[in-house]
């Protein structure tokens, strides 16, 4: 019995003190020689049993929080009690009148026996908010609550049309998620992973995607006006018809992206890489592409009036039927064919 209490206390500490994949694996792995032997001969039976209990602990916590809090932004209760967890009582005592330790005290009890642990308040609150987020948007609870960086684990989540205005999604994992038509206006997505996500028609204006991963994402028709995409990874992303007015993409990796039909008026793409990018019928008036790497990029029927390509790499860059008036190309590196094209254009417009 004592070992059972210790095991459950360890699970509670891992789930609500860390919430990561590594913490889940550590908490659900066999602990004794006997458990390792049984686990081996049952082809992982001990681990499966522990994983089931771990998941039940998370789901019970989520339901308890949902039933005791008016919304996920409300203060957490000072005492959270989970009854009948495998015959045990699990209690979380937050700092307050009855707890001056500054940490969340976890107490697992059964009859006259108990086990106590402590977990950081900041981690506990972040994990509880993540559970409530899933409840609010009807997402099934996952045994991995947070990423290794401390963001929410929302991998593959279906959040179509969700209102995520000003949401904190820093370091979150939204890879493969479906956010079609969602509103992320002013959302903080710094360092988040949106690889392969569907962001078609999303409202991302004034949002922060600094150093975020948007590789292979589908962002057709999305609004990114005034968004911060500095240092973001947008390789192979589809940005067809996006509105990116005054968007900051400086230093972003946009290799092989498709920006056809996009509006990039006054967008800052300085130092960005757009090698092999496809840009057809886009509006890029007054766009800043200084020091950008545009090698083998293809500009077709695109308006580059007033764009700044100073010091850009234009080797083997294709410009076909483009508007090049007032274009700046000082110290740009370009192939002979590109230089000839610019010379012919300027001579025709003198």
From Swiss-Prot:
Key words, A-Z = Host membrane, Membrane, Repeat, Secreted, Virulence
Q: Anything noted about its domains?
A: Contains various tandem pentapeptide repeats in the C-terminal region. The pentapeptide motif is required to efficiently recruit kinesin-1. No position is completely conserved in these repeats, whose consensus sequence is A-[DN]-[FLM]-X-X. The C-terminal 38 amino acid residues, specifically, the C-terminal motif LFNEF, are required for peripheral localization of PipB2 and redistribution of lysosomal-associated membrane protein (LAMP). The N-terminal 225 amino acid residues are sufficient for type III translocation and association with Sifs and SCVs, but not accumulation in peripheral vesicles.
Please tell me one Gene Ontology term that the record gives under cellular component.
extracellular region
Entry function = Effector proteins function to alter host cell physiology and promote bacterial survival in host tissues. Involved in the reorganization of late endosome/lysosome (LE/Lys) compartments in mammalian cells. Necessary and sufficient to link kinesin-1 onto the Salmonella-containing vacuole (SCV) membrane. Required for centrifugal extension of lysosomal glycoprotein-rich membrane tubules, known as Salmonella-induced filaments (Sifs), away from the SCV and toward the cell periphery. Required for virulence, but not for intracellular survival and replication in phagocytic cells.
Query: Could you tell me which residue ranges the Pentapeptide repeat domain spans?
Result: 162-201, 202-241, 247-286, 287-326
Q: What is this protein called?
A: Secreted effector protein PipB2
Q: Where in the cell is it found?
A: Secreted; Host membrane
Would you say which domain of life the source belongs to?
Bacteria
On assembly, the entry states: Interacts with the host kinesin light chain (KLC), a subunit of the kinesin-1 motor complex.
Source species, please?
A: Salmonella choleraesuis (strain SC-B67)
Task: Enumerate the Pfam families for this protein.
Answer: Pentapeptide (PF00805), PipB2_N (PF21684)
Q: Which SUPFAM superfamilies match?
A: Pentapeptide repeat-like
